[in-house]
Amino acid sequence: MISLADITTVVSRVLPHYDVRQAYLFGSFARGDQTPDSDIDLRLACGDSMTFGTLYELSLELEEKLGRKVDIVTNPPEHMRQAFRKSIEQDEVCIYEAS
């Protein structure tokens, strides 16, 4: 089964090719209670040049390299519904920061 370290390695190799400043893992993989069917949940802090098309390409590349469905959230926390933001903030882990 894929691990947090595996996800971090792939994300750290892929994201430098995109306008992403930070990536946070949340959900079951961040909590350590993932199942064989779990998807990978990421919250990305993107730069201004990130388009929906590029974001779609990024998600496909991550899914191919990780062998799992990847759900990406790009809204800043202050723009999220409070209940959703709280659930993310409880377990999110920063797994990438652009240099």
In which residue ranges do the predicted regions lie?
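Catalytic core of pol beta-like nucleotidyltransferases
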Residues: M1-Y24, A30-P36, G47-S99
